[in-house]
Amino acid sequence: MQAALDVVTYGEAMAMFVATEPGHLAHAAQFTKRIAGADLNVAIGLSRLGFKVGWMSRVGRDSFGGYVLDTLAREGIDASCVTVDPRYPTGFQLKSRNDDGSDPTVEYFRKGSAASHLSCDDYVADYVLGARHLHLTGVAPAISATSCELAFKLAREMRAAGKSISFDPNLRPTLWPSAEVMANTLNALAALADWVLPGLAEGRQLTGCESPADIAGFYLAQGARGVVIKLGAEGAYYRTADGREGTVAGERVDNVVDTVGAGDGFAVGVVSALLEGRAIEQAVTRGNLIGALAIQVIGDSEGLPTRAALDRLESAGQRAERIEETAAAH
């Protein structure tokens, strides 16, 4: 009998080909194969920290699908609810390499992929409800209408069972029919979550609010227990339903190599700390730390630390002083 999961998530994993030299993708001659997928990045990060993680998806019966399954096995992620679908392919993407710290160009080849055919038929109640926590992003609901239905099914069932839910909007505007549909759908999904983790630009686009405090207020009014807003190099702002509010300064990074995956690393830090029962201030501090680690290497998940590595960094005791509580927290 399978041990109960700490965390369950779902989404699309893709093979990713990263250019080995900087420059325009059209001129790239050589690539390195890696794995990509926002939800999977979080699953990998949490598994490396010792959590029992299950990931739900569909992959094609092809070499890319085999690569995804091999990665799951290597990372210790439960794949018993990953379906190998012979009818559709596994998606892939190309990513440029930038040496100046700017965001790389990413081109996706995912239309009609196996994962886009995820639906409520993939829901397995015992598997999902056996987990303590559900992590969702806004990517999987965007890839198809049926996958979106599954996202709401997962959130509603976990909420009804009294389990905790975190949600990172992780906007992909090109996958949605309109900005209005995207905002309405993702805000409805956020209303089912305990913890909402948008970036500042994402929060502004989704809520129409400008300040971090007002964006957080929007989601708290929908019933969230807490909202953490990523501020890039400035760190992150948090506000909770029980009145805590503050800003945690960002980690200094002298050599930014690959910005993709920073938000997923941040989510790993916040979610892992909350599952350990740590205070929100500590969770945001860890989120900043792991997000900073993620951007110092090539690849979306390669910089995510093991538990031993994280413990060494946190035991240095140099980051707690970076928490700056506002008056509202006292």
Predicted regions, residues:
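Conserved beta-alpha-beta core of the PfkB/ribokinase-like small-molecule kinase fold
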Residues: 133, 139-218, 234-236
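Short beta-strand scaffold segments in enzyme catalytic cores
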Residues: 44, 92-96, 235-238
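Conserved N-terminal subdomain of the carbohydrate kinase-like
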Residues: 52-138, 311-330
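Short, conserved phosphate/pyrophosphate- and ester-handling motifs at nucleotide-, phospho-/glycolipid
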Residues: 46, 199, 263
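Glycine-rich phosphate/adenosyl-contacting loop at the front of the ribokinase-like
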Residues: 1-78, 256, 321-330
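Short, electropositive alpha-helical surface patch
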Residues: 63-77, 182-192, 215-216, 246, ...
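Conserved phosphate-binding/catalytic region of the ribokinase-like
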Residues: 1-8, 156-160, 208-330
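Active-site metal-binding loops of divalent metal-dependent hydrolases
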Residues: 13, 169, 265
